[in-house]
Amino acid sequence: MSSFSAQGILDICPKDLAGRLDITLFDELNSTNTYLKKLARAGAEEGRIIIARRQSAGRGRLGRSFYSDAEGLYISVLIRPHMKAEGMVFVTAMTAVAMARAIERTVNADARIKWVNDIFVRGKKVCGILCESAFDADALSEYVVIGAGVNITEPFGGFPADISAVAGALLPYGNRQELRSSLAAAFLEELFGEYAHIDSRSFLDEYRRRSMVTGKSISVISPSLTRHGKAIAIDDDCRLVVRFDGGTTEHVSTGEISVRVD
């Protein structure tokens, strides 16, 4: 059994990968992404990783707060891919596939992806992903910080009322320490395995296969408008192809979606 520590995680990783990683684990941070972005701006190298047992100010997409239960897995990974802004969605898709595989390896549960950045198990959201980047004068990324937060087991007393309908955990109970170490190591192995050939976008077909929204009735939510339609496909640019109720078909690249019950 491996302890939940930086060395414990490295001990599980393949040796060639472990030698390229620099992991620091904290009991608590306000946000692993915020902490790692500061290191990135100061010149930290690719492969720098920050992990926390708990976040006091976790962040999600669109500036939302992210619920961070004590003893979850909150991990941020620094990469330096030198790509344009339009390539960032593929980093998110790659991360989602890597985490879905890691979950299946560690808890043997079917993991599905809700476009564009959430992982669901047994119909409940167990993981959120947030990728953040900075760009140079040539519009190429100076760094990308990949953040993922995973609910390992259900919190004592259940999830807060405002998210209890959608939030879930990998296990109702169990050894968090062992599972967190195994999950972190599996995620890093899958992530860097795909990152080695990210330009091929070989993960995109699997991203499509794992989609939990394709073929479903959905609502596309923006600050000024909510529209209803059906998710038809995910295109080669990782946009969601939606046939709206009015008859138009659009390739959606931004916004929030919810799956509707017909």
Language-model features: locations:
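N-terminal lobe of the biotin/lipoate ligase/transferase fold
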Residues: 1-105, 127, 135
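Long, positively charged amphipathic alpha-helical accessory segments at protein N-termini or as interdomain linkers
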Residues: 2-10, 85, 93-111, 121-262
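Short loop/edge segments at beta-strand edges and connector loops
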Residues: 27, 113-115
